[in-house]
């Protein structure tokens, strides 16, 4: 166990589902993670997603997932300072979760549409 794991405080309980939902359970976080898997890295790219996340919510979620070790922030422009985001190993390990949600959603919501990029994410798993 790493020091990071030993120092975790449980917000509601020590149930792994509860702990995961405390970080990922809002309606935006997994969509941001999805976009990172699809190659989006910059703030404006996240804002351009079809779900139309508000800027204040996006800023909050990016800070939150960075603080929890799912992404790292890197400067790509100095003046004005602009950042891009990259998944960490911990963030990358959410791929099977997203793939399972795609599969489940397609099974139970047949009218849903999958973006071409999401289709690619699912096909990468099959290859």
What feature does the model see in each segment?
Residues 2-21:
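Short, Lys/Arg-enriched N-terminal segment that forms or immediately precedes the first helix
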